[in-house]
């Protein structure tokens, strides 16, 4: 991986990341393609209408079905999905916790049962790297010990200590594999934990950032805490993260979250919000959210967002989108997803341009003014 900082404007950063498959300009939002596809879209839709340089895949789901060995046989993720740009795959730990009953964690890893057939599985730090080697992703996330908030101080402390031990095991294993010719073009990120406790976040960041990782993520946020708590935690944590490596905030979030966390020095984001909300009838615009289910759009001939350059806004009316949604027409899911993802990626592009031109604060003021804030 090649990483360079192109420009900073206060704490906001415009950077360039080069992987084996694409050149990624930050700030970047990564559409979520959980099972190897962004829901309602195919690789042609992505290439034609969204044009992301990187998307996210889910290690847990791809391991459970169709299986990482199958995907390896089919040319890894790039050959299997025909998406030619970069993939980031998460470790699958979050899904192992959230989708499985009777999850057990020990010093070696996580025991869980498949949400599909109840079969028993064991994820270890080395196992999730082996799986991601088979998937062939450009950026791999390591296994970490997740903590659901609120949690006791003892539980958070134990989580940080275990995450550090697993991180040490993971980086040693990955670098040894690379010397054997395995995962040579794959990059690996560690995940900083600690809840919203500043002392724990500092401890986790300092312990992990001394290790030879290609980038670092802030995990364990956007799980129900107040927005300001998230922002404060990110602002506190980034000061302990190396400037010369990418910073990734996992599972975040709303357009406001993206703007606020870019202003605090974050480079990379992912979230299911634009795709999930699209399917549920919520569309994102420069002026806030549009609930396409509302009767007021029945005869509205205007686009979803008059400032949006996406194919949907250039072609179709709010009235038509509302009709498709109410009819449960599959075409609606595709069009709404294209619009929401275009909006998100264009927002990142606008932020990058503002940083490069040293007018990020003005951009932020305009962003909120359009929303009446």
From Swiss-Prot:
Positions annotated to bind Zn(2+): 308, 310, 313, 339
Region feature RNA binding, mapped onto this chain: 251-257, 275-279
GO terms for biological process, alphabetical: queuosine biosynthetic process; tRNA-guanine transglycosylation
Co-factor(s): Zn(2+)
Residues bound to substrate: 90-94, 144, 193, 220
Assigned keywords, A-Z: Glycosyltransferase, Metal-binding, Queuosine biosynthesis, Transferase, tRNA processing, Zinc
GO cellular component, one term: cytosol
Keyword Metal-binding: yes
Assembly notes: Homodimer. Within each dimer, one monomer is responsible for RNA recognition and catalysis, while the other monomer binds to the replacement base PreQ1.
Functional summary from the UniProt entry: Catalyzes the base-exchange of a guanine (G) residue with the queuine precursor 7-aminomethyl-7-deazaguanine (PreQ1) at position 34 (anticodon wobble position) in tRNAs with GU(N) anticodons (tRNA-Asp, -Asn, -His and -Tyr). Catalysis occurs through a double-displacement mechanism. The nucleophile active site attacks the C1' of nucleotide 34 to detach the guanine base from the RNA, forming a covalent enzyme-RNA intermediate. The proton acceptor active site deprotonates the incoming PreQ1, allowing a nucleophilic attack on the C1' of the ribose to form the product.
Protein name: Queuine tRNA-ribosyltransferase
Annotated organism of origin: Sulfurovum sp. (strain NBC37-1)
